[in-house]
């Protein structure tokens, strides 16, 4: 389930991790990266962090797949002050996105 940091050389995400934080996986959306760690979810683009929340601050995740379009991943935080994220996931990232959803689901069931 876990991937080592050195296996995923993505500076968009790696510089955000704490020294003892474990990156489980990341998936690329059209305009951003979703990272799933042992502590939190991160959504970042090349310019900034769009969302950085722990699992206990997550309200809902929705994944929709339609014919002839990228999938849509919606991440809704519990607090209205944290902006929901709408990510377009290309077909080549579906497997990673599905693994991310499994980890997120496990974490939500624990909180």
Report each predicted region and the residues it spans.
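Short, charged, intrinsically disordered terminal tails
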Residues: 2-8, 99-111
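Anionic N-terminal interaction surfaces
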Residues: 1-34
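Phosphoinositide-binding peripheral membrane targeting modules
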Residues: 23-70, 76
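Polar/charged alpha-helical tracts
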Residues: 15-19, 92, 99-102, 106
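Generic detector of low-complexity/intrinsically disordered segments
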Residues: 19, 25, 75, 88-89
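Generic hydrophobic/packing signal
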Residues: 65, 77-79, 105-108
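Canonical phosphoinositide-binding patch of PH/PH-like domains
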Residues: 78-100
